[in-house]
Structure formats: structure tokens, C-alpha cells
Amino acid sequence: MLFRSKRATILDDEGAWFGFEQEYFFYKDGRPLGFPTEGYPAPQGPYYTGVGFKNVGSVARQIVEEHLDLCLAAGINHEGINAEVAKGQWEFQIFGKGSKTAADQMWMARYLMMRLTEKYGIDIEWHCKPLGDTDWNGSGMHSNFSTKYMREVGGKDYFEALMKQFEKNLQDHIAVYGPDNDKRLTGKHETAPWNKFSYGVADRGASIRVPHSFVNNGYKGYLEDRRPNSQGCPYQIASQILKTISEVPTSKKAAA
């Protein structure tokens, strides 16, 4: 009941679209899947979107594809999968229209992954920086978002005002973007420092990455907040994004 009552207070907007990119590690016997018993495998590089046994092993792809099928059968908008930067690290993407719908689907997708891996004797590590201060990437839940106004009206002035509001609300966002984010958002490994706000076109090292398509379309479309981490609550994340957006005046209404 407590969870349901909290969910009821979350800001929602059916015209707001969210795409969550959930990263995670497969773990076996307390180590990332594919790691040797001691030490580390070859450095990061070939694992990202990798293929072949030496890069992804023999079971991980079977699991992620089975998870995709389970999600689709459950009516979840599972949009894609890929091997991630670190060995044993993967990602799936969930899309939803409305913050509650998107968050509901992400929550269920996480649950299905954990239930699925039980039969393989594999654990899911959701921590955003399970390998600590090493040269291995952490895990995020990059949050792509847009409102009807952003998609249909937008404009450079509105975009710049929106970025100023995101900067002003930096601490409010970090507070709900997942625990231990200071360990992940260090300015290294494709992250921006947790205590500084930045944005840039196609910039993986920015707080908010701006797609080329957004700029080329007259500053209309979606944006990607790269700060939420893999442990973050999708309800709180989406709600805070909508709260910040709601604080920025709009010059005219989007089409009904």
C-alpha cells in the first residue's frame, strides 16, 4: 500500500514520453560474468556491442534475448538490447508514454530479468559502480524524455531556458537519480561530475546529451539525461524531470 500511495503522488503527463536505458551486470560467484577468478580480463573496448565468445561468453546473449521475449509477451515496450562497455555488462531499453506507464514497465522488466536469471544460477548486479574506483565503467539508466511541447514547438530559446532550470535544480535531480551516484558520476567513463551541470550535442560526457536530430529539427524532439543510475527509481526520476520541465514557461501551446 505504501508503494501504491507514493506512486499516486508522482507527476504524470500522457504527452510525456520516456525511454529508459537500463544497464546492469551479470554476476556469477561474486564476480562479473566472464571475469577470471582473480584479477581482470582484457581492458574495455571490444565488449561494447560485442559479439563472439571471448567478448560476451556463451550464455549472456541467450538470457537477454529470452528476457526480451518475456517482456514482449507481457506487453512491455522493450525496445532493444546491447552488450555494454564492461565485460559482463549489458543494457535493455524500455519506452513508455506517460511517466507512470514508463516506470511501471521498467519496474516489471527488472523483475522479469531477476526471475529469469534464477534458473541460470546467475545474479543481477544493479549497483551503479560495482567494481569501484577502477578503469571499468559503472552502470546508468540514461533517461530519454520529451513532452508534446518539446516535440511540436520547442525552439532554441525554450531549450536554453530548460537547461538553465535543469542546472538550477541540479541537487533535486541528483537526490533521486540513484544511490552512490558520486561513485559513478566522476567525470570519467563517459560521465559528467555529479556536482556540475553540463549539456552538449552528442556529448557522452555531459549531464544532458543533445541529439543532432534535436538541433537539426529546430530544437525540437527529445533529450537524454545521462545522470540517473542503474539503481534509480524510475518513478522518482521521471517525476523530477517533469517537475523541472513544468517550471519553464512556454510561449504557445502544442497542437491538441
Language-model-detected regions and their locations in the chain:
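Glycine-rich, acidic/polar active-site loops that bind/position phosphate-bearing ligands
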Residues: 1-256
